[in-house]
């Protein structure tokens, strides 16, 4: 484990220790925000979480203070510092009586099956795996077989990212549960974005979780690994819990900066509440499975329809930030139609130099001339943007590693008043295969905030402005350009 995540989690644990155990989450909200509970009866409070550290602190604080239930749904849950310590915090919540349910997609799960069983052995913890046909409990032979016999199913993933606390507070957005999504990887971090919610939209988020949890796609880990369950003893589960707690409580894991930072951490959560913007919030989601599969790798979905509707109705401007930019069928034509109507379209995305996904970039690379001809303004993020010290307050301590930054936020502003923040990438996979979630909000205030953030990422010191005469593709090694050239030859666009 590296020192920087230890430093943050030390702060989180000390912050949590300052809160009165057993205090109801709603009561704490009422005590620290005089009119929040009254507003929550009809409106949803929303606070955009731009920085990884505040997004992580918010999750940790809510996990520590939930009293009844915590329901989390993620595409990726790593076994790195953030993933391990997040699991420890959930286990700690379960030990004080909170019902914890975890739903994770099967494709990119890091944890070994036995570790999952040891955690789910706690009576207050349930773990289910979405569409388990690749990793958990799947042999190498079965995995190869599934490529040929269940190709669409293998590619249909749950890309949702939600965390719900006592049915009162919720967080959704682009961040998975791993170091690089919270600015705590020393070498590569994502420029990401979440949104914290209080109020009716959280009820809609909860309904979506229940639909996925009870669907035929969500399989209890004990059912997947039934042959291993019998080998798990209470002593094994207790040892696993003790190991997690020992790591979290070991002062040797904490950096010397903790005492200085703790005085400020305790002020953060009330400050987040004071910065809430209150309005109607529409939570959008897909049904489990995305669609009925009758159109193969196509078919669209509820989230696809809603977002394309928002773009189609634009009157004067569309501003998009997406890590991957491969428009599905009809997308470029729609942008051209909008541009001809006088709608200004600007998109912030990754460059070849910053991207973590060369195959996805290849799809964008092929479409880029057509996007430019359609009137779209393109801004490609630099791997070492000038903004990096503002994204991460502790950047000076990382500078020696020269870390790469890449966009992972999925956001949109239409006509300076409608925003989207969620999990939807502007690519065929999000449009047709992966289930997605997010929020659509009509708010000039939040639109101004989000526009400022994206436009800052598009400044010359942070992004290259790609045109028909200039692209930054040569700002990378020859090896990466050769990789791009090879991938460009493959017919994989529907899967990107």
What are these regions (language model features)?
Residues 17-161, 165-496:
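Charged, low-complexity intrinsically disordered terminal segments
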Residues 7-16:
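Sec-dependent N-terminal signal peptides
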Residues 2-6:
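Positively charged n-region of N-terminal signal peptides that target proteins for export
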């Amino acid at each position: 484990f590296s020192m920087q995540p230890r430093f943050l989690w030390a702060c989180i644990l000390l912050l949590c220790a300052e809160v009165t155990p057993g205090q109801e989450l709603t009561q704490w909200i009422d005590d620290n925000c005089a009119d929040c509970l009254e507003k929550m009866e009809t409106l949803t409070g929303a606070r955009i979480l731009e920085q990884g550290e505040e997004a992580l602190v918010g999750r940790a604080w809510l996990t520590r203070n939930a009293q009844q239930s915590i329901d989390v749904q993620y595409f990726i849950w790593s076994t790195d510092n953030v993933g391990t310590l997040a699991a420890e915090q959930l286990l700690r919540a379960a030990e004080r009586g909170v019902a914890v349910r975890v739903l994770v997609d099967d494709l990119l799960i890091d944890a070994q099956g036995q570790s999952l069983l040891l955690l789910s052995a706690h009576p207050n913890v349930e773990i289910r795996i979405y569409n388990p046909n690749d990793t958990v409990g799947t042999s190498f032979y079965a995995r190869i077989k599934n490529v040929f016999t269940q190709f669409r199913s293998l590619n249909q993933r749950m890309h949702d990212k939600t965390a719900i606390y006592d049915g009162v507070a919720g967080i959704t957005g682009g961040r998975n549960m791993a170091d690089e999504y919270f600015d705590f990887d020393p070498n590569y971090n994502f420029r990401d974005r979440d949104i914290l919610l209080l109020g009716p939209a959280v009820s809609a988020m909860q309904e979506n979780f229940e639909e996925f949890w009870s669907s035929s796609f969500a399989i209890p880990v004990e059912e997947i690994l039934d042959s291993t369950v019998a080998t798990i003893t209470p002593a094994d589960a207790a040892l696993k819990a003790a190991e997690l707690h020992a790591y979290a409580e070991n002062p040797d894991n904490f950096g010397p900066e903790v005492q200085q930072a703790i005085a400020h951490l305790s002020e953060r959560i009330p400050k987040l509440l004071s910065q809430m913007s209150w309005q109607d919030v529409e939570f959008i989601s897909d049904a489990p499975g995305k669609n009925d599969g009758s159109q193969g790798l196509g078919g669209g979905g509820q989230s696809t329809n809603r977002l394309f509707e928002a773009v189609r109705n634009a009157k004067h401007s569309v501003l998009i930030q997406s890590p991957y930019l491969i428009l599905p069928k009809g997308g470029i034509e729609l942008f051209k139609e909008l541009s001809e109507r006088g709608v200004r379209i600007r998109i912030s995305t990754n460059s070849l130099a910053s991207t973590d996904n060369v195959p996805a970039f290849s799809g964008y690379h092929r479409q880029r001339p057509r996007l430019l001809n359609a009137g779209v303004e393109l801004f490609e993020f630099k791997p070492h943007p000038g903004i990096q010290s503002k994204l991460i307050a502790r950047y000076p301590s990382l500078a020696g590693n020269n870390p790469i930054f890449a966009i992972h936020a999925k956001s949109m502003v239409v006509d300076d008043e409608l925003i989207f923040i969620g999990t939807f990438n502007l690519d065929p996979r999000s449009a047709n295969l992966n289930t997605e979630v997010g929020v659509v909000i009509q708010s000039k205030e939040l639109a101004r905030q989000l526009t400022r953030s994206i436009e800052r990422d598009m400044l010359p010191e942070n992004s290259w402005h790609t045109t028909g005469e200039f692209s930054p593709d040569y700002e990378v090694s020859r090896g990466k350009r050769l990789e791009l050239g090879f991938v460009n030859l493959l017919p994989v666009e529907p899967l990107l």
